């Protein structure tokens, strides 16, 4: 079924690239029309005279890292695009950036050291009570809101039980944000969230042996998992419904005497699922926010699951794909509305975006801030766009993604970007039709967005029209047995979904090609 989806996906992407630098033509039989490519394979074609007004037709796509890791996005489908946006970053109100998978490479201090092996496990972290490991401030907080659930898991060998020794903690200006510590007696553990502490005792947890230990936190309910036992032990004590949303360093191993191995943080409830070495080919594991394997003697604190590692994997998947393409940083969500409303934050944001682009050799950035509705918000968003262009310079590719309900940025902002993508879809099924597609594009052009700068978005998913009820085209094909290339509605899991069929996307692409738009997304 996956091969069927890939075939359909490549068929669609092939159509999208068909009109690059030319007028759309359909030539099933007969003589090719004037202007089409003719000749035999291997014949030399006379080059056209360069046209300074010629623009490459944009075939753009977002990449979500979790979809890529679970093989929902192939190298071939990415290779069919000439512009790829890796959607991974989010801004804080002060203009700082965070990522869906932060780079949590940890620094070892004191006597925290790499050990090649210990008591049957290879590549481990050794702690003697005087050292610790600091993974920076990227974990258990978010510009999208406080964490209400997570799992922390690790293999641990306790050489000597020390009351208060930390498996991990976050402390801000002397106040505990969150801490997971050994308790007063062997087998006793305590979890502190803010000013509240809950405790648990499990006699299976003993010093002098390796154990898998995981704590899950779900809206204030904490559970402990030990070794292979899938039955959790509940913590006793009342905890708040979320972790204080404070940016503070994530520190492991302070005062701990023993060893750690295969330590991870996940945003879901994993229980014993992290007990084996983690691979990232299933949905739950893609939500692993940090993974320290301690198997690199030169960099024992290396985080093995980051957005930057995903970026390199995307680049590797594109090896051998024909043609040139841009890979750009996608920035969405977070506290963007607060950020654009503050001049100092806008400056910080622009400088941070530039730094990331340069550090990771990216081709530019895309802003997908949903949505500015008021005149003030649109004006502030426009200022952020203009300032970002000023900081990036003219040679870095910059775009914004807008929506038919929110596209009226300033003329200066329109001039500052290389193109504007218009998301002609949404939770409402009314946005999916060909007629609405045309009218939304016309409205944006009438407002003042140049037609050749407007990249029109099409949906590769279906919706029932109810918020939260969307299904990816991948699933409609793979699980819903969608085979009809003309069906704009389909029954899936007992509900009717509105989508764009292959034929509808073909028609929209043909319309974009024939009417001078900048591209398709």
Place the predicted regions along the sequence by residue.
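Extended recognition patches within non-cytosolic domains
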Residues: 96-99, 261-305
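Chitinase-like catalytic core of GlcNAc-active glycosidases
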Residues: 52-107, 111-115, 255, 301-436
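Bacterial Sec-dependent N-terminal signal peptides
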Residues: 2, 10, 14-55
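Glycan-binding loop/region signatures in secreted carbohydrate-active enzymes
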Residues: 41, 52, 79-81, 95-97, ...
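Extracellular glycan-recognition modules
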Residues: 96, 100-102, 129-190, 267-274, ...
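Flexible glycan-contacting loops in extracellular carbohydrate-active proteins
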Residues: 234-259, 284-289
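Short hydrophobic/aromatic patches on beta-strands that form ligand-binding or substrate-lining surfaces
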Residues: 84-87, 99-101, 151-160, 168, ...
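Extracellular glycan-interaction surfaces
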Residues: 107-131, 152-162, 179-241
């Amino acid at each position: 079924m996956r091969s069927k989806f890939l075939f359909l996906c490549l068929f669609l992407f092939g159509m999208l690239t068909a009109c690059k630098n030319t007028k759309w033509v359909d030539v099933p039989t007969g003589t090719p029309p004037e202007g089409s490519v003719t000749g035999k394979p291997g014949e030399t074609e006379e080059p056209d005279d360069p046209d300074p007004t010629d623009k490459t037709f944009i075939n753009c796509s977002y990449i979500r890292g979790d979809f890529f890791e679970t093989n929902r996005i192939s190298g071939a489908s990415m290779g069919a695009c000439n512009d790829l946006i890796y959607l991974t970053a989010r801004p804080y109100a002060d203009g700082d950036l965070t990522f869906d998978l932060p780079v949590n490479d940890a620094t070892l201090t004191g006597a925290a050291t790499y050990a090649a092996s210990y008591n049957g496990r290879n590549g481990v972290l050794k702690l003697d009570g005087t050292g610790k490991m600091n993974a920076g401030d990227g974990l258990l907080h978010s510009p999208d809101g406080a964490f209400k659930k997570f799992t922390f898991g690790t293999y641990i060998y306790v050489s000597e039980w020390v009351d208060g020794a930390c498996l991990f903690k976050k402390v801000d200006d002397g106040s505990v944000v969150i801490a997971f510590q050994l308790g007063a007696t062997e087998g006793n553990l305590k979890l502190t969230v803010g000013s509240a502490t809950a405790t648990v005792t499990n006699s299976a947890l003993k010093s002098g042996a390796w154990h898998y230990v995981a704590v899950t936190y779900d809206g204030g309910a904490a559970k402990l998992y030990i070794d292979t036992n899938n039955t959790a032990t509940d913590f006793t004590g009342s905890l708040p419904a979320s972790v204080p949303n404070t940016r503070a360093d994530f520190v492991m191993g302070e005062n701990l005497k023993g060893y750690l191995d295969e330590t991870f943080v996940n945003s879901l409830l994993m229980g014993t699922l992290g007990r084996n070495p983690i691979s990232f080919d299933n949905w739950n594991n893609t939500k692993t926010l940090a993974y320290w394997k301690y198997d690199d003697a030169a960099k024992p604190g290396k985080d093995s699951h980051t957005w930057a590692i995903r970026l390199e994997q995307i680049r590797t998947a594109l090896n051998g794909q024909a043609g040139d393409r841009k890979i750009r940083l996608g920035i969405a969500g977070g506290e963007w509305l607060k950020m654009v409303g503050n001049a100092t934050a806008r400056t910080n944001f622009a400088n941070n975006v530039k730094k990331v682009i340069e550090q990771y050799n990216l081709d530019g950035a895309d802003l997908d801030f949903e949505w500015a509705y008021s005149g003030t918000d649109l004006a502030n968003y426009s200022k952020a766009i203009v300032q970002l262009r000023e900081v990036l310079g003219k040679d870095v590719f910059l775009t914004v993604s807008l929506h038919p309900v929110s596209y009226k940025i300033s003329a200066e902002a329109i001039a500052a970007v290389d193109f504007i993508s218009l998301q002609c879809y949404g939770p409402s099924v009314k946005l999916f039709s060909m007629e609405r597609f045309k009218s939304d594009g016309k409205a944006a052009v009438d407002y003042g967005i140049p037609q050749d700068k407007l990249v029109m978005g099409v949906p590769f998913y279906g919706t029932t029209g109810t918020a939260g009820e969307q299904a990816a085209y991948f699933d409609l094909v793979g699980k819903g047995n969608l085979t009809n290339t003309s069906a704009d509605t389909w029954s899936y899991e007992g509900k009717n979904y509105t989508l764009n069929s292959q034929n509808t996307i073909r028609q929209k692409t043909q319309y974009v090609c024939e009417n001078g738009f900048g591209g398709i997304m």
